[in-house]
Amino acid sequence: MTWFNRLKDYSKQQTDKLLNRYLTQIPSGIWRECPRCHSRFYYRRFGNFDVCPECGYGFRLTARKRLRMLTKDAVEWDADLVTKDPLSFPGYSEKLQRAQKITKLNESVWTGLALLDKRSVALGIMDPYFIMGSLGMITGEKLARLFERATLHELPVILFTASGGARMQEGIHSLMQMSKVTAAVNRHRQAGLLYIVVLTDPTTGGVIASFAMEADITIAEPKALIGFAGRRVIEQTVKQKLPADFQSAEQLQKNGFVDEIVPREHLTEELKLLLDMNQSNAWRANHDK
């Protein structure tokens, strides 16, 4: 009996020591779990595009990381515009400062002039890490200016959306941005110019209810969450269980709201192809006049 007790204590002691030593040696983030299929992989398996090797889900990206994936030639617009906390909402200023520090952005969207395959485009990229990419006053102002500049200089617009909706800390000022940006989109369309939107995970709330669904060509990333209200809110309202693919990019494509679903690793080439087609059509239209 004494021998068994000694062995048990000895084993337990050594196991604790070994585990503690190994745990301190393993860097954080070495294993990652996909939020869609819940598969776990060594972080390098996700590759340069941060895509799950099992189901193809694209992990959420900061605006600057996505910009680096798209192009090396870009000039930022309106980097000096900063929200001033119009309602003096408790804790909002501190939240803004944290978001600015994490994302290196002044607001939840990056806008600027970019070159894709030597073609100039007005580019907008929303950042889900900046207060969930929420639509605030300055976000709306930057997006409106993006479309206005594109209209003035006859440029196509490519917009990557990622948002939790309107920013509650700005109240009605936030909601007004939906119509403001949509009006700028309509003026851009009336000028006969191309607008491509890429819906990424997540695109919800006031953004999907306005300018995100106004594009000439609507692309989505695989497995992206796209919808207005949350699943639980809808289920509680309609008293029904929603299907598993509800508010997914695949379901929206099936029902005609999305033109195509493009894996992230092929997205840049697809955008270049669409810009080439648009350029050819524009040349043909001018040539036929």
Swiss-Prot record:
Give every CoA carboxyltransferase N-terminal domain span. Answer: 30-289
Reaction catalysed by this enzyme: N(6)-carboxybiotinyl-L-lysyl-[protein] + acetyl-CoA = N(6)-biotinyl-L-lysyl-[protein] + malonyl-CoA
Q: Name one Pfam family in it.
A: Carboxyl_trans
Per UniProt, which keywords does this protein have? ATP-binding, Cytoplasm, Fatty acid biosynthesis, Fatty acid metabolism, Lipid biosynthesis, Lipid metabolism, Metal-binding, Nucleotide-binding, Transferase, Zinc, Zinc-finger
Question: Where does this protein hold Zn(2+)?
Answer: C34, C37, C52, C55
Compartments in which it is found: Cytoplasm
This chain belongs to which protein, by name? Acetyl-coenzyme A carboxylase carboxyl transferase subunit beta
Native organism is Oenococcus oeni (strain ATCC BAA-331 / PSU-1)
Q: Which gene encodes it?
A: accD
